[in-house]
Every structure is written in C-alpha cells, then in structure tokens.
C-alpha cells in the first residue's frame, strides 16, 4: 500500500510540474510582444519626382558608409546619459544600418542632383566613378532629452583628389518614449545630411 501511494504521489508531482510548466510557457508567450522593424528615410519633405538626365554627365559613387561599432547592430541605440547608452531590443532596424543609410540616400540624391548616374559602394573597378561621396557616421542616436542627433564626417573626392572634407551636425526633436517619433527625427537628420551633400556636389556636375 505504501509503495502504491508513493508511486501515485510521484505521478501526481510529475503531472503537477508539467502543468505548471505549460502555464508558464503560455504566459510568457502571451506577454512577449513581437519585434518591430524600422527603416530610415532621407527624403522627409522632399519631392523626388524630378526629371533625371540619362546617359550623360559624370558618374557618382555613393559610399562606403561607415559606422562606429556601437551603432553597427540591429537593435536601436538610445542615450541614457552623456556616456551611457541602452539597446532597445524590441525595436530593430530592418537591415544593417549602414546599408539602410546608403539605400535611403541612394533613393533621394539622384532626383535632387538631377541625374541618375549614381551607383552604390562597392562598384566595379571599371568604368569607375568621377566623384565619390564617403560618409563616416560618428553619432546617430536620441539623447536623454528626446533630441535626435546625427554627426557625420563626409567627403567628396574626384579621382585621387579630395575636393571637400567636412564634419556636419544635424538635430531634430524626437521623443524619449515614442519609437516612431525617434525614427522620424533620425530620418529628418539624414535628410538634412543629404541636402548638404547636394548643395556641395551639384555645382561640380555642370
């Protein structure tokens, strides 16, 4: 009789454990939110429906675009203090951030420059490019006050000659809690960078 009771108690404990584990897994599944993905835009407030020149004019190479290691990840980065950052794991970039920045600029710069003769890095060695725009992103985040900031060191080169080498800083009001507003503000900063590149590059294409 004692052996039978012991056997039944063990079975009861086993089923109780499995039942609790099942409820725990179901609870975690219900409470976890799906990851949301975002893309930057470099054409905020810009009309991209401009007539482009075809197979004439100099060829422009966009890139490479380089990021510091702390930004080279899919999770979004938010500044908690001047020297402290946190990752927002539930909100991520839809692709590598350097590729996202490159694509966003590539989609809007041709219309602003009036030419479709632009290729993205890396490009074939031949025929090569006449002008190259290189960008080093030094800062791209939202600070503890909800201010988005983009700091970029960028240059325009022609063959082996550097025509312009400049550091630019752009800001836009974002949010400390609303991810959509953060991405919108970062897109506004990227748009400003693209406009500054156009102002300096367009006169060289004539």
What are these regions (language model features)?
Residues 2-17:
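Bacterial N-terminal signal peptides that target proteins for export
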Residues 59-64, 77, 132-136, 149-153, ...:
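Soluble periplasmic/extracytoplasmic beta-strand elements of cell-envelope proteins
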Residues 84-92, 161-192:
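Short secondary-structure boundary motifs at beta->alpha junctions and helix caps
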């Amino acid at each position: 009789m004692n052996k039978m009771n012991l056997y039944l108690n063990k079975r009861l404990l086993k089923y109780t454990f499995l039942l609790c584990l099942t409820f725990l897994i179901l609870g975690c599944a219900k409470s976890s939110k799906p990851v949301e993905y975002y893309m930057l835009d470099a054409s905020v407030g810009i009309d991209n429906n401009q007539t482009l020149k075809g197979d004439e004019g100099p060829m422009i190479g966009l890139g490479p675009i380089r990021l510091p290691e702390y930004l080279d990840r899919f999770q979004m980065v938010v500044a908690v203090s001047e020297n402290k950052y946190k990752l927002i794991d539930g909100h991520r970039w839809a692709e590598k951030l350097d590729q996202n920045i490159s694509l966003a600029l590539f989609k809007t710069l041709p219309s602003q420059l009036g030419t479709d003769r632009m290729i993205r890095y890396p490009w074939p060695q031949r025929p090569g490019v006449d002008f190259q725009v290189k960008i080093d992103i030094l800062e791209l985040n939202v600070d503890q006050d909800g201010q988005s900031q983009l700091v970029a060191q960028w240059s325009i080169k022609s063959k082996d000659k550097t025509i312009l080498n400049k550091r630019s800083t752009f800001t836009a009001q974002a949010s400390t809690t609303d991810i959509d507003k953060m991405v919108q503000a970062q897109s506004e900063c990227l748009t400003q960078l693209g406009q500054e590149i156009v102002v300096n590059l367009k006169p060289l294409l004539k």
